[in-house]
Amino acid sequence: MKQVFKIGNSEELNTTECDLLMEIGESHVCFGILDHSTKTLLQSGYFTTEEKDNGDILQNIFEQNAELRSPFHQTVVGYYMTENVLIPSKFYFFEKTKSILQAMYDGMQNIVISESIPGWQMYNTYHVPAAIHEFINRKFAGGNFWHAHSVALKNGLPQREEGNLMVNFKTDSFSVMVTKGNSLLLAQIYPYITAEDVLYFLLKICKQLSLSQTNVSLILSGLINHDSAVYKGLYQYFVNLQFALPDDGIRLSESFSEYPVHFFSSIFKLALCVL
């Protein structure tokens, strides 16, 4: 397990007045601790592992970060998992959708979860590694759990006739949600190693969905900044680049002063689901 960053002082926390916000991926875990009344992010940590789908990373994180074992006002978990399908509500049947998911992916060691997204009239069905699902259920029996795509949809996506690509970066993957007008065209997670990998996928998406590189807007969030090779590569091929703005009402404590606000967009979106 590798710690990418840990921000904030756990000694000053009163966790019973805070919300624990946690995003769990196949090779990363990040968390935020938010003061519920002031809507201020007090602490955040980001960890990675080379062993995918391994529940041990969660065990290690909880052992090494004692504050996570404290009682919280409420807990929200977002599953950042690549194996998912979005189905319009009128075509949704759980067993049929489960069969589609299992036909697309090897689901032998996975749990199938399905959740409704009423505002979009669709269901999101996805795999969660059994070891991770069991660990989280033991720790947070009364928590709120959604897929990362579901969280983004619950918060609402910007509408623009020329199209939007909302791109959120992790250390070795990025998610893309594409809208045109009020329609969702794509929600997918891609792996990457180099800036060229990111360009390849985004240019391919624009070509397949007939989106103009000149007119489409890229809204960037997560672990990316102006000086990164990824941003410089995108700047050469896309005209409209912007970093995600902070969500209304949520603030960062002084401990975060050296970090861009858009680094924590995923945590903010989890918070907005329950505030």
Residue ranges and their predicted role:
Residues 1-275:
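Hydrophobic/aromatic-enriched cytosolic interaction surfaces used to assemble or bind macromolecules
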